[in-house]
């Protein structure tokens, strides 16, 4: 985006709703948490779409209107994000939706590892139920992928984003084939790439199968389903899916046979949704699932889900990261010859948040907003500061990923107890786990981040290199724009590394890796690389 901050229009005020943190962003839209004033316990997600900018990028008001109509028709299932209402003014389209309070599902899955089969079964079954419901409404999603799979406060899956959805069948009428080639290449069915028309319901089935594969092993099976072009997909087709190399060799035979039945390149032999629901691998009880196919033990599920997350900061981890990063560095350097990384990645959310942050310095994270005259801040002794830093950091579940697996269970139980009060704070929901804390001075912190990014081939010339040390010391927030490629998919990854002062009276910073475009697993992999290479900046409880 080329819009300057001074040109950005203010967000419309919504009656009876207070606006909170940004939880999603893009080139012409931003998603924020909203709190009902008359019912403070009720939180919603509010998506703001800038009409002029979206129109300029080829997304018309009419197209957005069609998406909203389809989404409204599909609202009503417990595993689909509900659409409450929407409206518009001369500048913005605003959409009030159900808030998936626990954020991205795939933000909580370790790349290259995945989750255990019981959890994968739980989420796959909920995904199939959601897709079956929208198909019953005559709608095909056509963009099932990790970016569009969220989870609520109880750990249940929520299918989101109907931007590419299509009405494939109206009441009592025959199916209509789709002809436009849309979706994310790793999750697209082969018939989308190769045919003149395809059954969008069966391409949804294929995408569900790829999602299941990723749940089980934490990586995509191929970059795109093009025979003779993609080596991994070609190998899969040549051997009829009967592969013995990693990660296929870690799956048991029953699961592998089921997955191959879902991922049949020939549509006529691929399992339908109805057949999938009746398959023995799917149609059995799950310890996390109640009779309504929803989560019955959120605490146990969250403990299990987070158990594989790990960011190692040992010398060996640094050595392995540097060794594994050489090819990735070349990939990024080559990619950035074709795109301009000389300007910040000014997603809509960054622009809006920058305006707010220019109006006031960071406020304490543990209390209501305070105003200090003449920048005279209250002073605390070192012991008090350490206790207050610990109080802030220890409440964040993201810190568990830096704890060794041996201490994970006891730490998790302790953290869950301390979360009781924290969860009652407004706008603390839907935060990502791709973040760490630091108690280093801002100048040292930014220098370490810059060096880490350079080591994996990411330019910072347009985001922070122009800032002097004096400039940095005056800032409570620093945004580092990111525009790179995913290591496995070779698809664009865009976002922002946001360095925020947690409390204006403490030298404590939260470094958040906020994705605006791309695969959540590959974004987490990027977060891990930068964090490991920034080891000396990471504060661990």
Task: Pin down the residues of each PLM region.
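Conserved short submotifs of the Hanks-type protein kinase catalytic core
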Residues: 90-104, 108
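Terminal C-lobe "cap" of eukaryotic-type protein kinase domains
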Residues: 265-289
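Activation segment signature within eukaryotic-like protein kinase domains
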Residues: 123-124
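Protein kinase glycine-rich loop
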Residues: 20-27, 31
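Activation-segment/catalytic-loop signature of the eukaryotic protein kinase fold
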Residues: 86
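Conserved N-lobe beta3->alphaC-helix segment of eukaryotic protein kinase catalytic domains
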Residues: 43, 48-74
């Amino acid at each position: 985006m080329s819009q300057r901050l001074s040109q950005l229009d203010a967000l419309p005020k919504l009656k009876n709703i207070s606006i909170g943190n940004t939880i999603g962003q893009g080139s012409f839209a931003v998603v924020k948490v909203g709190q009902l004033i008359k019912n403070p316990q009720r939180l919603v997600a509010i998506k703001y779409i800038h009409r002029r900018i979206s129109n300029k990028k080829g997304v018309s008001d009419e197209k957005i209107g069609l998406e909203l109509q389809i989404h409204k028709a599909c609202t009503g299932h417990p595993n689909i994000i509900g659409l409450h209402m929407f409206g518009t003014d001369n500048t913005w389209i605003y959409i009030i939706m159900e808030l998936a309070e626990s954020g991205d599902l795939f933000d909580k899955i370790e790349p290259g590892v995945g989750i255990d089969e019981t959890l994968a079964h739980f989420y796959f079954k909920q995904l199939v139920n959601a897709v079956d419901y929208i198909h019953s409404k005559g709608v095909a999603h056509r963009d099932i992928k990790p970016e569009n799979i969220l989870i609520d406060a109880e750990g249940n899956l929520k299918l989101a984003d109907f931007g590419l959805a299509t009405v494939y069948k109206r009441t009592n009428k025959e199916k209509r084939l789709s002809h436009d080639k849309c979706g994310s290449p790793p999750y697209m069915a082969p018939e989308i790439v190769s045919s003149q028309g395809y059954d969008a319901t069966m391409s949804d089935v294929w995408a569900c199968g790829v999602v299941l594969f990723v749940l089980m092993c934490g990586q995509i099976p191929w970059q795109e389903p093009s025979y003779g072009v993609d080596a991994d997909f070609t190998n899969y087709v040549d051997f009829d899916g009967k592969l013995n190399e990693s990660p296929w060799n870690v799956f048991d035979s029953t699961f592998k046979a089921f997955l191959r039945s879902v991922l049949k390149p020939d549509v006529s032999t691929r399992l339908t949704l109805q057949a999938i629901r009746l398959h023995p691998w799917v149609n059995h009880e799950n310890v996390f699932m109640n009779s309504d196919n929803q989560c019955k033990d959120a605490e146990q599920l969250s403990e299990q889900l987070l158990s594989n997350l790990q960011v190692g900061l040992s010398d060996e981890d640094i050595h392995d990261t540097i060794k594994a990063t050489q090819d990735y560095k070349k990939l990024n350097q080559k990619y950035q010859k074709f795109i301009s990384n000389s300007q910040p990645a000014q997603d809509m959310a960054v622009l809006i948040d920058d305006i707010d942050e220019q109006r006031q310095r960071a406020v304490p994270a543990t209390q209501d907003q305070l105003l200090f005259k003449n920048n005279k801040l209250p002073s605390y002794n070192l012991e008090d500061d350490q206790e207050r830093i610990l109080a802030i950091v220890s409440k964040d579940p993201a810190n568990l990923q830096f704890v060794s697996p041996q201490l994970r269970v006891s730490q998790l139980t302790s953290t869950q107890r301390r979360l009781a009060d924290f969860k009652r704070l407004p706008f603390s929901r839907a935060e990502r786990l791709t973040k760490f804390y630091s108690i280093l001075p801002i100048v040292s912190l930014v220098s370490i981040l810059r060096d880490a990014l350079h080591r994996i081939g990411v330019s910072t010339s347009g985001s922070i290199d122009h800032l002097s040390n004096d400039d940095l010391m005056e800032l409570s927030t620093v945004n580092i724009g990111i525009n790179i490629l995913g290591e496995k998919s070779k698809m664009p990854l865009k976002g922002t590394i946001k360095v925020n002062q947690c409390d204006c009276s403490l030298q404590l910073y939260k470094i958040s890796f906020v994705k605006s475009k791309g695969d959540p697993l590959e974004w987490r992999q990027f977060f891990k690389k930068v964090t490991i290479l920034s080891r000396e900046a990471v504060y661990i409880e």
